[in-house]
């Protein structure tokens, strides 16, 4: 896959080019871009599959560039590589598939590049278009701070949310992350896709597999993607879960 690097710092461009060059299956396009205007021009002429994009640049910044790319039918995948970690929310709004904080590590870059396939790009671009009603609608991704920087998790990959004191654990297809968001706020935003099964747990409706009663009279909910593990359903939510399962 062809990769275009966009950064206003020459040393940063050189380092990213070196890291990409060490990975099989990727080719760094020349020339690279040092600002947003150059980036858009080179994207038009070079047709990259992936853009490694800095955020803070003179003129058009990286978020503005990505927003313009969202307007295209088949935009390249955008992976932000930035020294700033405070732009994660804006990043998923412009369909970024990765958000890496400098200094970028080779293994994190490799993982982000793997996610940047063309079907995912088209899908992400569609997800970030405003609803026809004109409302803002729920997020298509959830951002979480991890050891790799800021991770953007597609909502369709989320299996459950479980609250534990002031944090919420998000379980997704590739693992778990911690969120600093109230469970109630997540329920209010994503209630059409998730159902409450306990005062501290929300599960993805489409992941529900079966409800089972234990010999002690408790109820366990088995979810697709959990490899046989189950979550406890509180008695007050059993009837609602059963009704939902009849509708699925």
Curated annotation (Swiss-Prot):
<dbReference type="GO" id="GO:0043565">
    <property type="term" value="F:sequence-specific DNA binding"/>
</dbReference>
<protein>
    <recommendedName>
        <fullName>Positive alginate biosynthesis regulatory protein</fullName>
    </recommendedName>
</protein>
<dbReference type="GO" id="GO:0032993">
    <property type="term" value="C:protein-DNA complex"/>
</dbReference>
<keyword id="KW-0010">Activator</keyword>
<dbReference type="InterPro" id="IPR039420">
    <property type="entry name" value="WalR-like"/>
</dbReference>
<dbReference type="InterPro" id="IPR007492">
    <property type="entry name" value="LytTR_DNA-bd_dom"/>
</dbReference>
<keyword id="KW-0805">Transcription regulation</keyword>
<dbReference type="GO" id="GO:0001217">
    <property type="term" value="F:DNA-binding transcription repressor activity"/>
</dbReference>
<keyword id="KW-0902">Two-component regulatory system</keyword>
<dbReference type="GO" id="GO:0071978">
    <property type="term" value="P:bacterial-type flagellum-dependent swarming motility"/>
</dbReference>
<dbReference type="GO" id="GO:1900192">
    <property type="term" value="P:positive regulation of single-species biofilm formation"/>
</dbReference>
<dbReference type="GO" id="GO:0042121">
    <property type="term" value="P:alginic acid biosynthetic process"/>
</dbReference>
<dbReference type="InterPro" id="IPR001789">
    <property type="entry name" value="Sig_transdc_resp-reg_receiver"/>
</dbReference>
<dbReference type="Pfam" id="PF00072">
    <property type="entry name" value="Response_reg"/>
</dbReference>
<comment type="pathway">
    <text>Glycan biosynthesis; alginate biosynthesis [regulation].</text>
</comment>
<keyword id="KW-0597">Phosphoprotein</keyword>
<dbReference type="GO" id="GO:0000156">
    <property type="term" value="F:phosphorelay response regulator activity"/>
</dbReference>
<feature type="modified residue" description="4-aspartylphosphate">
    <location>
        <position position="54"/>
    </location>
</feature>
<feature type="domain" description="Response regulatory">
    <location>
        <begin position="2"/>
        <end position="117"/>
    </location>
</feature>
<dbReference type="GO" id="GO:0043107">
    <property type="term" value="P:type IV pilus-dependent motility"/>
</dbReference>
<dbReference type="GO" id="GO:0005829">
    <property type="term" value="C:cytosol"/>
</dbReference>
<dbReference type="GO" id="GO:0006355">
    <property type="term" value="P:regulation of DNA-templated transcription"/>
</dbReference>
<dbReference type="GO" id="GO:2000147">
    <property type="term" value="P:positive regulation of cell motility"/>
</dbReference>
<dbReference type="GO" id="GO:0045892">
    <property type="term" value="P:negative regulation of DNA-templated transcription"/>
</dbReference>
<keyword id="KW-0016">Alginate biosynthesis</keyword>
<dbReference type="InterPro" id="IPR011006">
    <property type="entry name" value="CheY-like_superfamily"/>
</dbReference>
<dbReference type="GO" id="GO:0001216">
    <property type="term" value="F:DNA-binding transcription activator activity"/>
</dbReference>
<keyword id="KW-0804">Transcription</keyword>
<dbReference type="GO" id="GO:1901031">
    <property type="term" value="P:regulation of response to reactive oxygen species"/>
</dbReference>
<dbReference type="GO" id="GO:0000976">
    <property type="term" value="F:transcription cis-regulatory region binding"/>
</dbReference>
<keyword id="KW-0238">DNA-binding</keyword>
<dbReference type="GO" id="GO:0045893">
    <property type="term" value="P:positive regulation of DNA-templated transcription"/>
</dbReference>
<comment type="function">
    <text>Positive regulator of the algD gene, which codes for a GDP-mannose dehydrogenase, a key step enzyme in the alginate biosynthesis pathway.</text>
</comment>
<feature type="domain" description="HTH LytTR-type">
    <location>
        <begin position="142"/>
        <end position="247"/>
    </location>
</feature>
<dbReference type="Pfam" id="PF04397">
    <property type="entry name" value="LytTR"/>
</dbReference>
